[in-house]
Amino acid sequence: MAVSLGASSRRRTAKLRRHVRVRKKVAGTPSRPRLVVTRSSRHIYAQVIDDVAGHTLASASTLDVSLRGGEGDKTEQARKVGALVAERAKAAGIAAVVFDRGGRTYSGRIAALADAARGNGLDF
């Protein structure tokens, strides 16, 4: 007897498959750390991680004091987070990163954050 999955289970399973596939290919090094983007329904978070040492080198999110208040829609907030994480990464001496979208599709808020980080000097 075959059990069919509901729509939300299929989406969750597809996200998990994408996440595993991306993480097999993407790893951060000290010279080129990983830019990880995590998204919830309300907030977006970005971290620059050196996987060898296991340390976060720079981070930004919509929960930061400088970004709190929610000016604009969620896509505009993602752009601000991308610009802020790029600024903090450059201050930490990081010019190039590898992008880890965390199993999310490259569209909407994920793409807005990535484009803003690229526009503010991060190379990926």
UniProtKB/Swiss-Prot annotation:
Alphabetically ordered keywords of this record: Ribonucleoprotein, Ribosomal protein, RNA-binding, rRNA-binding
Entries under Pfam families matching the protein: Ribosomal_L18p
One Gene Ontology term of the molecular function aspect: 5S rRNA binding
GO CC annotation, single: cytosolic large ribosomal subunit
Biological process, per Gene Ontology: translation
InterPro entries reported in the protein's UniProt record: Ribosomal_uL18_bac-type, Ribosomal_uL18_bac/euk
Similarity-based family: Belongs to the universal ribosomal protein uL18 family.
Its biological purpose: This is one of the proteins that bind and probably mediate the attachment of the 5S RNA into the large ribosomal subunit, where it forms part of the central protuberance.
Matches recorded under NCBIfam families: L18_bact
Subunit architecture: Part of the 50S ribosomal subunit; part of the 5S rRNA/L5/L18/L25 subcomplex. Contacts the 5S and 23S rRNAs.
Protein name: Large ribosomal subunit protein uL18
Source organism per UniProt: Frankia casuarinae (strain DSM 45818 / CECT 9043 / HFP020203 / CcI3)
Lineage: Bacteria, Bacillati, Actinomycetota, Actinomycetes, Frankiales
